[in-house]
Amino acid sequence: MLRLGVSRTPINRQFVGYEQRRHFIVASALTLGGFVFGKRAKLADAMENGELHNKNNDDEAIRKDRMDKRLKKLSETRPIKPRYEGHVPLYPHERMLLFAISGLKSFFHPEDGNNIVKLGESSAFPFVLESLKQCMLGDETGRRILREQPNITSDTLDMDRLKKMDKNSLGYTYYTWLITEGVSPDTRAPVKYIDDPLQAFIFKRYRQCHDFYHAINGLPIIIEGEIAIKALEAANMGIPMAALGALLAPLRLKPIQKERLYDIYLPWAIRTGLSCKPLINVYWEELLEKDVNELRKELGIQPPPNLRAIRQERSKIRKELKMKYDAYEVGM
């Protein structure tokens, strides 16, 4: 019995070795087959798409053609056909989901502009945009803006021209604000999720004019300045996203920032927004050479206290107090 038991060990080892070799051979064969047949499948797809014998080897054209096919296929699954370039129609449940997700992301990650953009469009309800349209139709300049549909970019504004304007002009004020803040008119995202083409333009116009509201009031793009401008927009134009930003964004601020907002900038924004001319009807591009102080008077805008100066003064005081405290500690 001992001999029989001992003689089984080499047999088992041989069997295990055979099984291991067999698995290795099978795995190798499957890998090789997948490579060969997978390559053949890719070749077949290329032949079907007419890409195998592309003598020009125009990869960019091929990618564009593929993208067009995907977009066409995607458009067939949408509730309506796209009505302007870049339009992405959404079902009601998709719009609600976009609103909820972008709203949460905007609250926890306000530094991500994409979230703000999506929240703005998903909350731009048709009745709000229709109200803005009626406001524009009731104003001569507003009607002309709707008719001409201008586009605010670095090229249309001619930045070289702006920097040569009079120091007190709107154009120079706007130009220096852009340089100071490190932004450009070209950074505004295109509208995608608003179905009506005219309403889409109105929202684009509101979005593109946002920096003029900053510049004419001397407010930086730091969070306190953004909240103040959002409150101004909400009071002046009734933009839901602006109202949400003005209400919820302060919850994440430091106590001293909240104090400045509630004591100075939010009261100013609401008072100014309710009393000044509807800003959606201002043709900013035609007023670039106008004296900025005269324009403020015409619009009914009185700029708030300089936010950067207030912050710098507080920072200076804190540094002086820290130096005195450190000197006291050394003296002890």
Curated annotation (Swiss-Prot):
Where is this chain's protein located in or outside the cell? Mitochondrion inner membrane
Bilayer topology reads: Peripheral membrane protein
Question: Which residues are in coiled coils?
Answer: none
User: In what pathway does it function?
Assistant: Cofactor biosynthesis; ubiquinone biosynthesis
The membrane spanning regions, by residue number, are none
Pull one GO CC term from this UniProt entry.
extrinsic component of mitochondrial inner membrane
Disulfide bridges in this chain: none
The organism's place on the tree of life at top rank: Eukaryota
Per its UniProt record, the required cofactor names are:
Zn(2+)
Residue numbers binding Zn(2+): H210, D211, H214, E226
Q: By its UniProt entry, which InterPro entries does this protein fall under?
A: Coq4, Coq4_euk
Uppermost EC category: lyase
Reaction catalysis annotation: a 4-hydroxy-3-methoxy-5-(all-trans-polyprenyl)benzoate + H(+) = a 2-methoxy-6-(all-trans-polyprenyl)phenol + CO2
Give the EC number(s) under which this enzyme is classified: 4.1.1.130
Q: Name one GO biological process term.
A: ubiquinone biosynthetic process
Report the transit peptide positions.
1-24
Return any one Pfam family short name. Coq4
What keywords appear on the UniProt entry?
Lyase, Membrane, Metal-binding, Mitochondrion, Mitochondrion inner membrane, Transit peptide, Ubiquinone biosynthesis, Zinc
Which family is it part of? Answer: Belongs to the COQ4 family.
Tell me the function of this protein.
Answer: Lyase that catalyzes the C1-decarboxylation of 4-hydroxy-3-methoxy-5-(all-trans-polyprenyl)benzoic acid into 2-methoxy-6-(all-trans-polyprenyl)phenol during ubiquinone biosynthesis.
What is the annotated quaternary arrangement, including any partners?
Component of a multi-subunit COQ enzyme complex, composed of at least COQ3, COQ4, COQ5, COQ6, COQ7 and COQ9.
Q: What is this protein called?
A: Ubiquinone biosynthesis protein COQ4, mitochondrial
Q: Which organism is it from?
A: Zygosaccharomyces rouxii (strain ATCC 2623 / CBS 732 / NBRC 1130 / NCYC 568 / NRRL Y-229)
